[in-house]
């Protein structure tokens, strides 16, 4: 016999309604958190949103000891530094960052650098 499962949640975030945070220098940009467990009940916790860094800004090197992260660049160009190695960050670049891996993002162009991110769990 097949197991019966209760339906999961549905939740919609319209443009301009995500939780938004200003990031001070050196990023000097903003991050939007569209989905996370504080907003909707999830069987498999995750967080999803966007980040924008203006020309000359960067996200400081950091790591997540309990989370994996996916980054997908949707506008602009810059660089990602993954465990000390530079990689181009341009439209369509997808990056997977495993737990405890150092990473940072640098906008060394003349336009905003914009990406979508997903963090699990």
Named regions from a protein language model:
Residues 31-37, 49-65, 99:
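Conserved short histidine dyad/triad with adjacent acidic residue
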Residues 60-62, 80-81, 97, 103-109:
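Short beta-strand His + acidic residue motifs that chelate non-heme Fe in jelly-roll/DSBH
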Residues 51, 96, 110-121:
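A short hydrophobic beta-strand segment most commonly corresponding to one strand
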Residues 75, 83, 120:
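Cofactor-binding loop segments of dinucleotide-utilizing enzymes, especially the Rossmann-like FAD-
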Residues 84-99:
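Short acidic-glycine-tyrosine-enriched beta hairpin
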Residues 45, 50-54, 63-80:
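Short, conserved beta-strand element in jelly-roll/cupin
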Residues 1-46, 60:
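A short, N-terminal "cap"/entry segment at the start of jelly-roll beta-barrel domains
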Residues 55, 66, 85, 101-102, ...:
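A generic "binding-loop/recognition-motif" signal
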């Amino acid at each position: 016999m097949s197991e019966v499962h209760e339906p999961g949640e549905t939740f919609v975030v319209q443009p301009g309604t995500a939780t938004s945070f200003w990031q001070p220098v050196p990023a000097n940009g903003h991050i939007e958190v569209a989905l996370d467990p504080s907003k909707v009940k999830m069987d498999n916790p995750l967080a999803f949103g966007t980040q924008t860094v203006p020309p000359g800004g960067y996200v400081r090197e950091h790591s997540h000891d309990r989370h994996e992260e996916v980054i997908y660049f949707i506008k602009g160009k810059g660089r990602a530094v993954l465990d000390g190695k530079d990689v181009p960050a341009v439209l369509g670049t997808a990056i997977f960052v495993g737990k405890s891996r150092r990473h940072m993002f640098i906008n060394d162009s003349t336009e905003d650098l914009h990406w979508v991110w997903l963090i699990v769990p």
